Structure formats: C-alpha cells, structure tokens
Amino acid sequence: MKPIARALISVSDKTGIVPFAHRLQARGVKILSTGGSAQLLQKNNIGATEISTYTGFPEMMGGRIKTLHPKIHGGILGRRETDATTMAEYNIAPIDLVAVNLYPFEQTVAKPDCDLATAIENIDIGGPTLLRAAAKNHAAVTVIVDPDDYERVLREMEANGGALSSSTRFELAVKSFEHTARYDATIANYLGALTPNGEKSAFPRSYNIQFAKKQEMRYGENPHQRAAFYVEQPPPAGTIATAQQLQGKTLSFNNIADTDAALACVKAFREAPTCVIVKHANPCGVATGINLQEAYERAYAADPVSAFGGIIAFNEPLDPTTAKTIIKRQFAEVIIAPAVTTTAQEILTSKPNIRVLACGEWSSQTAAGWDYKRIVGGLLLQDQDTDTVPLEALQTVTERSPTPQELKDLLFAWQVVKFVKSNAIVYAKNGRTIGVGAGQTSRVMSSQIAELKAKEAGFSTQNAVLASDAFFPFRDGLEAAAKAGICAVIQPGGSRRDKEVIAAANEWDMAMLFTGMRHFRH
C-alpha cells in the first residue's frame, strides 16, 4: 500500500483535529478542508487548501453544497489502477484519507425547543456521502469518523512508512458504515414520528436502532444456544451495559439477564441502603437497612436457599464489611454496585470466581428508555415500567387505614412487586421481603407460595403486609392472605368484584390501598 499523500478533513466535532492535522502535515500529507474546519486549521498554521479553491467551484446555498463535486468524489472513489487513465484525463488527484464527522442531528433534535426546520438543516448530506465513498473504496482509502481513531492511525502510519494495513482500512470502513447507518436511522426515527399536522408520536412508522457487539458468549440461556451481548449506542450510564467488571469469570447470558433484573429493582430504592438478591430474574430477597451490611443480611435471610448462586445488587458503593460478610455466608454468581471500595475489592479477590461489577452512579433523571419484547416476526415496544404512585394518589378503600409502619411496609412491598414475574405476590415486614410468590397462573397460588417461603425462612406472617401486582379477581385470594396473618394489602384495584374483595378485607379488619396502577411483568 502506498503512503497517504492527500487527506480531506471536514468535521463538526473538532476534538483532536488540530494535532492530528499537524502530524499529517509533518509527514508531508497535503490537506483539503471545508469551511470552519479549514479556518481552524489555517488559524493553527496548517496549510489546508479549501475545497472551493481546489475544485474551482464555490460553496453555495448556505453551505448545503461543499464537497459534492467529481474532483472530490472521483479522488475518493477512483480505483487506483483501473481508473487511473480517467483520473488523469480529468485532472483528479487521489484522496487517500478522509476524516469526516457529521452534523449533530441527534443532539439537535434532543433539545426541547428544536423545530422541524432546525432539524432539517442539521441533516448532513455531503458528510455521509464522503464517508460512504471512502468506506466503499477502503482498498485504497482510509476513512476516519471517530476522533478516538486519530492516534491509532498516526501510530500505524509512523510504523509503516505512512501507509495503513488493509485490515485497518477495512475495520475503519465498517465503522464508518455503522456510523452512517445509525445516523440515517436517527433521522428516519425522528421524521417518521411526525404526523402530517406536525405533532410528534412516541412511535415512528418504522423503528430503527443500532446495537454494538460487546461480547460473544460460550452459549446462551442453554448450552445448545449460540449467544452474544449487544449494547445500545450510546449505552446509558449506570447499567449492566456500561458496568466495569473488576474480577471473576466472563459473564454468561444468564448472568447478564439476572444482573439487569437485580439492578433494575435496586434502583427503585433511593432513600436507604438496599440490597436485592435475584435468582432466575426474580427477586428472592429485598431489604433496606441502616447500612449495606444490615441490608444484605436481611435480604439473605429472606430466602437463604434461593440466594445460593444468586445475583446480589446494592444501591450504594460496596464496603469492606459487607464484602467480608457475603463471602463468609454464601456463594454468589455476581455482585454489582455503583462502586466497590479498594479494600472491599481486595477482600473479594479471595473468591476469584465471583464476578464483581461496578456500574457507576445512576440518576433518577435519566430517561428510562424503551422496553423491548421480541416475538416471532415482530417486536413489542413499550415504556419501561418506572412510574410510581404519589402518596396522595393512594386510595384507602377499607374502614381501617394502615398504620404508619404498615404504610411504610406497603410502599416498600409495592416497589418490589413490579420486579416479580406475574402473577406476583410479595409478603413484607419491617422493610424487607419475607416471602415472594412469582410466576404462577393463579394469584391464590402465588400468595400460598409467598406464605410458604416465609415459613421456610422462619418468619411469622402475622402482621405482615402484602403487595399484589394486579387486582384480586375474587375474595378468596384476600381471605387466604388474611388467614396467614396479613394485616394490610396494596393492589391496583379495578376488578368487577372489588366490592366483594373490600368487604372481605373489612371482615378481617385489614387495611387496603388501591394504587390504580398495575405492574404485570412477563
């Protein structure tokens, strides 16, 4: 491969472009550039030739047409041997490197005050055309769309006499096509969500999203299934997608799915140190405490059998005392927290197979995004189930109101039940779960399982509270809970037989709250 002799630079994101161009110039590379990029380079003593000077054709239409010229695209697309005669005939010089990034369409339309006209003006035309041309002809041209690649390209040029390997050019070309695909997908999503009268729908006519492969796995949910882990571009902070693995074996398919479930649940608790232990995507123990150690001990005690080999999630940085308690008490597949102190990390190294993750802090203001459910031949798309019921919106429907402690436990249980597979019943007392009934086709059966779990763990269900993810269709489910000693219930309400269920609660002197919000989870 011949050394790079001529480069075209046209960037919206000017991060690192000046030192990059300086080093290209030092290697004798001739630089072509456009508008603001050319001005910046010239201001920094870089001899960049403006495109309009090079082509003899001015920029026009307010900058809409800059690089759409045969002398530019011929220089990029020309096959160095096959098209050499044509290039010479029309005085088209080869362009060996294209460094381009695009108008910030995604950032522009994310602004609340962005109107359609502004969005349209931020649709880049020349940039994607340059990138696609350079990527297509990667056999002869290096294309750079990401400022993070400048240093890598320069190092390879310095090591190879100014040239780049075919493998590097191919990799950068693929990256360029991925970038333009995502760019066009963002435009299509934005415009496709607009109605003819200018209103915006939450759901575009076609839905386009790009995920980048982060990890290939030994297998999927089961050993006979192939699998890989893909993450959104860009992935949201404070998630399994961005978590840093501090130690342990490679995360498996099931590890990632279960850790995501545990993290989603623990994020719902912001006011006290909280621990969530998950098994097969269902919380088996959730508890708050005065510190993380107490929260963990209480969550573990809620279901010690199920906690074995589970996923442990915390809403605060993991400290040494809690880390020591965990490794003395149980085997865990994964521990995840916003951060892990240095001493806690040192303690955990005594159990090198435990996967320890630091996911970073999360913000309650961070957009939750979409929930995807794949079906054969399609995709179901919905909001994440992150809505909460304001305290003032809770409706006491029984003769007796909950006591302050009952109310506190009801709100705690209500936060947990939305993360349990339907039909879901959660028994709770004093800020922790004591029994979880998950995934049953009968709500009565889920309640019975929750009671059984509580008794197996040595808890009394007397004066515990119950949360149900959906309404009780009949009074029998409520009566079963009352017989177990449940003193207060929180549920959505909305059954045709609500009056019968309320009557049953009154007969047993139970307090019951209606939330008006269902939390099915499938």
UniProtKB/Swiss-Prot annotation:
Query: Which terms under GO biological process does the entry name?
Result: 'de novo' IMP biosynthetic process
Keywords (A to Z) from UniProt: Hydrolase, Multifunctional enzyme, Purine biosynthesis, Transferase
Q: Does the keyword ATP-binding apply?
A: no
Q: Which Gene3D superfamilies match?
A: 3.40.140.20, Methylglyoxal synthase-like domain
Give me the Gene Ontology terms describing cellular component.
cytosol
A Pfam entry, by short name: MGS
- Top-level taxon of origin: Bacteria
Using the record's annotation, list all stretches that form the MGS-like domain: 1-145
Q: In which pathway does it act?
A: Purine metabolism; IMP biosynthesis via de novo pathway; 5-formamido-1-(5-phospho-D-ribosyl)imidazole-4-carboxamide from 5-amino-1-(5-phospho-D-ribosyl)imidazole-4-carboxamide (10-formyl THF route): step 1/1; Purine metabolism; IMP biosynthesis via de novo pathway; IMP from 5-formamido-1-(5-phospho-D-ribosyl)imidazole-4-carboxamide: step 1/1
Under catalytic activity, the entry for this protein gives: (6R)-10-formyltetrahydrofolate + 5-amino-1-(5-phospho-beta-D-ribosyl)imidazole-4-carboxamide = 5-formamido-1-(5-phospho-D-ribosyl)imidazole-4-carboxamide + (6S)-5,6,7,8-tetrahydrofolate; IMP + H2O = 5-formamido-1-(5-phospho-D-ribosyl)imidazole-4-carboxamide
Family under the similarity heading: Belongs to the PurH family.
* Descriptive protein name: Bifunctional purine biosynthesis protein PurH
Source organism: Nitrosococcus oceani (strain ATCC 19707 / BCRC 17464 / JCM 30415 / NCIMB 11848 / C-107)
Upper lineage ranks?
A: Bacteria, Pseudomonadati, Pseudomonadota, Gammaproteobacteria, Chromatiales
